[in-house]
Amino acid sequence: MNTKLLALYGLKYNPFTPEVPTEALHAYDKLENFCWRIEHALIREGGFALISGDPGTGKSVTLRLLSERLGQVRDIQVGALTHPSARLSDFYRELGDIFGVPLNAHNRWHGFKNLRERWLHHVESTLMRPVLFIDEAQEMPACVLNELRLLTSTQFDSRLLLSVVLAGDQRLNEKLRRDELVPLGSRIRIRFNTEYASAEQLMQSLKHLIACAGNPSLMSPELMQTLCDHALGNYRVMCTMAGELLATAAQQEKTQLDEKLYFECFAVPQSPRKRKPVSGGAHG
């Protein structure tokens, strides 16, 4: 959306795109509690945390909020794995790039040892574990997940060198129940399941979005309630519909988005009535 159209609605940015600033993301109580546990327990003790849920229920928002908060913690190193489906050799290369450790692709033991030494030095100098975020973790091969488990612990599993936050859909939960991954699944210390939101939660998020964007009265109260009632508990669906409404309103130069506009955009077209066949044959 261009600057002219944003000015028409008194907006600093389009509040319904995925690229909204982190401060525009609404942290409800359960999410706040999860972030607090990561910030005050996991990064100091290490281990695995798991974020799981269906698409559109808030996994990406959780990762963004958590990454932003941990990025403000002094002396902590935070990295994110961007290629979760990579094979083991590429997995090591990316870890080396994230944590600044030169790795030899043909000497996995050298990479294993150097990464652990880097993390151990970080722990001893800061008393906190580095953090690794892995989104779409359901795409990771089982051998890579097991290698990550072995990488992150020492002294017969009594000392943890890294904090890992895995995020994925329900396939990740199913994957962690497989026999070869039970040792990893049993080490998940903190779990957070993003659930379908109530209409009240959606309303809180919607109000927060448009207020942070600069125009709390962008939508009529009736339209906001209608959006929340028809979003199926899904934040992504709500924002997609709201974005469509904003684009349509801008095209029509409407100053406020209202319920009438909603029915114009999302009215279900009525199928034409079928004509009844004429009974009887041809007259001779």
Regions from the PLM with identified roles:
Residues 69-97:
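AAA+/P-loop NTPase substrate/partner-engagement loops
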Residues 3-5, 161, 183, 211-284:
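C-terminal alpha-helical "lid" subdomain
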Residues 67-70, 172-187, 196:
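Short regulatory helix/loop adjacent to the ATP-binding pocket of P-loop NTPases
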Residues 1-45, 267, 271-284:
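A short, basic N-terminal segment
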Residues 81-84, 176, 189-201:
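Conserved AAA+ ATPase "SRH/arginine-finger" region at the nucleotide-binding site
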Residues 44-65:
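Walker A/P-loop nucleotide-binding motif
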Residues 6, 87-91, 102-147, 156-160, ...:
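Mid-core helix/loop region of P-loop NTP-binding domains shared across ATPases and GTPases
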